Amino acid sequence: MNKNNSLLIILGFLYCFTGFAQIDASHKSTYEKVDNLLYLIDKMYVDNVDKSKLECDLVLGMSNQLTPYSAYQQSEKIAHLSIKEQVAYESIGISFKFKGDTVLVENVIPNSGAQKSGIVAGDKIIKIGDNDISDMYYYSDVVEHLIGKKNTIINIELIRDADTIISSVIRKNIPHYNLVVLANPKLKQSINDYENAIKYFDAIYPDSVENSLITEHGIRYMLEQLDPHSTYISLEDIHDMTAPLKGSFTGVGVRFQIVKDTIIVVQAIPGGPSEKVGIMAGDKIVIIDKENVGGIGIKNSDVRDKLLGEKGSKVIVNIKRTSIKELLEFTIERDKIPIYSVDVSYMVAPEIGYIKLNNFSANSVDEIKKAVYKLKSEGMKNLILDLQNNGGGYLMTAVDLSDEFLSGAKQVVSTKGRTFPEKAYETKFKGLLENGNIVILVNESSASASEIVSGAIQDWDRGLIVGRRTFGKGLVQKPINLPDGTQVRITTSKYYTPSGRCIQKPYEGGSIAYRKEKYDRYISGESFHADSIKFNLDETFETKLKNRIVYGGGGIMPDYFVPLDTTGTSKYYNSLIRKGIMNQFALVWVNKNRKKLESKYSSFNKFKSNFNTDKVIKELISYAEKEGLEYNEESYKKAEKTINIRLKANIAQDLYDYSRFYEIINELNSTLQKSIELIQDGEAFKKLAKI
């Protein structure tokens, strides 16, 4: 019996269903989109692919849009039960994905308990019952807590904009067939054909099915099964995904924050349209193009949509400024706004410069050069480049940045794929940083382009890598625009460091295990002890000049290990940060005291040397209590130093500019502090670098 026939028998048994509708012409574009994508994967993907499995994965992903009981959200709580027994269990009726330490609600099923309790798409769940989302690492962990006996109630704590809400949600009204059909492994294996699945969903699902939407979910799931980095980008997400790497976007040029449903300008970007017309930090935006934007429910995305637009177009904003009764009206002409990848650059010690790079964009090397010229004019002879939490970006930017450090013609990286020949990238020009000691700071979130630069510096014995083992992303994606304007990024090759290492960590366990691997390092002790790292002895290599032993197959191992420091944190501190209370308070407090602060601390250096948070802390604690965070003396004392420094950094950011935050907070950056010590202790540096 073939799979299509078995599908018909199962459907007929469960639903007395006797046939599929004819293919509607409206489905044609989605069919073509899927066909094009399957063809591209077959021709370009880094490894051989099973086309039939691809299409099966596509269908499984489509089913997730219609129900929370998808292939990768299947609950072990009910998997062993018979179909009849499974019917007694229901969920609250949402589909979701992880977003940081929260669960982002993507869709709410009509008439479900979630909908009736007021949960909406975009809500961020932080707690289910007594269980924090931050303690969950698998989709199945979340599902285990969402699923329960029919008509039972669960408390859901969530964040909507800046507000924390607790909803009592009943497990009820998830349609019977969602659980039976999509939790049935036999049936899931039977629906393995895209065209068949579209007909199937049209035929049995009681609500109208938007095929383009469920197809997008299917494509995402299918690509996720290939590897963790092949991905699909919708029209809505393309701008947010590409703007940081392009290095600019078109808008009015303000950083803002929403506090108590009020849009407050944190900074008018220097040289941008808003600064030119006179908008200032602390201004409150109340009207945009004659529409009142103050009030309950305003979101960051709503504000961005109103302020972004075509270059040369105009937007009228009305501002409430402290000490001025009347609203101020400004007409702003939208223009290109730079997105900087250098967060900060300054001298951290005599002769030692520091640059923090947040990604590898089209403009990153120019930004680095500008910073280097400035630092050299201030006496820099050695550089610390901070790539901690830098997730990467353009490969060629990584190559060009490495060229600034390496002399002569040296290979930086090579790439090789199944259908793409090996290609080597070498240094070509005389760089600004070919002399002096170099330290690269890395951690478990330094990935991709960050690892290319770190690998090249390490393999050519040019400097020291300090911190913790990097993420381990050695796959290269090619962005491909689809006819409908959406985009896919398909892994086409792997990259290799100059010594021949591929530092890609294993991903055969699936995307969830892949993402969780960073947490596994924490649990195993690797984040705290270098000797807890398990090297793959089959992936042993030597550096090019000093013949030091280095390893492949799982990130770049630093030359000097700095453990993760958790001694200065506590539950109270984490709540101040996670709930946004610290940021909100600092902005409100600075706005209230701005004139006095600007008069007393006319320069940042005065502020850094003389400002004390002792009196402000009491106001922060009071503000936090009003926001629902109960004060805990023991928890506060445990993180007292961290809380004070973080508050001072937030105030500096709001009073001066974004970069000043790092000049304060870096006092807590143990990896940076150790790197300064290594450079200043010349013998220790030479011993590690084998100079």
Task: Mark where each language-model region is.
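Translation machinery proteins
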Residues: S70-K99, P228-V259, P421
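Metal-dependent DNA phosphodiester-chemistry modules and their immediately adjacent helices/loops
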Residues: S448, Y496-C502
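Flexible, acidic/glycine-enriched loop-and-adjacent beta/alpha segments
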Residues: L464-Y496, G510-I523, F528, S532-F535, ...
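Conserved functional hotspot residues or short segments at active or partner-binding sites
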Residues: C502-I503, Y507-I691
